[in-house]
């Protein structure tokens, strides 16, 4: 049998003139997320985040981290941009949790 080809995330057929650098920021976000999979926490056999998500507390965990990093933004030297990337990453994880719960 043939395997269904996955859809591309970004359309290359039509070039959109983004006003707020969304294309560049989405690329940067993807690179940031990729790096989290190679971070020092990811080398452990079990991840705390996975335990939390698998035990049904993922949505609250993600929302809590969104609040934490949103409130911290602008208060930590040199890490402000990373705080915003973390907010978006936890937002994506919250969407994943939401979508997974909606399917069940």
State where each predicted segment sits.
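Intrinsically disordered, low-complexity regulatory regions
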Residues: 1-104
